[in-house]
Amino acid sequence: MSIALLGLDNSAVSTNLDDADYLERELDLLWKEQDSAGKKIFLTRVNQRLPELEYLFRDAASPLDLHWTLLAAISYQESHWNPQAISKTGVRGLMMLTQTTAKEVGITKRTDPKQSVVGGSIYLQKLINNLPESVPRQDRLWMAIAAYNLGFSYLTEARQITKKMNKDPENWDDVREILLFLTKNSTDHLMKVRIKEAVNYVQKVQLYYQTLSVIKRDKEI
């Protein structure tokens, strides 16, 4: 059985599920360039926190064109699956929604786990839908996730600049390249930090999503 994962490099993913060491080997490959402490914390929270929340991600993803492990990955990046999480800027809850976003998606209590996950999933789907249908599905997904962190207007501006620089505004890798280029040429320190955070945000979500996909598929086999 193949373990092809949406939009990610699967060259290192084994198809030999009879190998007893398969899961450990795949996780080692996925995290080989990552902080080992971060891996340990993530896997610990997969065991300790995710079981109580998994049904929320599954339920929220079900009516949408999303997979529950993707919502779970975004939530981990946002809050480490802590329903009471709050940032210095005032965003809070499992999906770290702003007050404005919460109102937009009909959420009244951001620290309520179910409301937060439902609200975050609706908001993500809106971001996906706001991108042109001509953008390939995988690229729309990564761009929407970048916009979840950075803001849709900044993503739109980055795509416009990508086109002006003769790159493909419908390809996430090209847009990401331009975002990083902008950080080298901007005098706005705060914006440089935000852009770098957004690019790193997508990379982390991809890592957590791929890790969860490997773990959960292994358990379902």
Indicate residue ranges for each PLM-predicted region.
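Secretory-pathway/luminal and periplasmic proteins that interact with or process carbohydrate-rich
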Residues: 79-88, 127-130, 150-165
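Short, solvent-exposed mixed-charge patches
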Residues: 220-221
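Extracytoplasmic
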Residues: 52, 66-71, 76, 89-92, ...
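Catalytic and substrate-binding regions of cell-wall glycan-acting enzymes that process beta-1,4-linked
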Residues: 18, 22-30, 144-215
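N-terminal export signals and maturation junctions of secreted/periplasmic proteins
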Residues: 2-58, 83
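Short, functionally critical alpha-helical segments immediately adjacent to catalytic or ligand/cofactor-binding
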Residues: 58, 65-82, 117-121, 144-150, ...
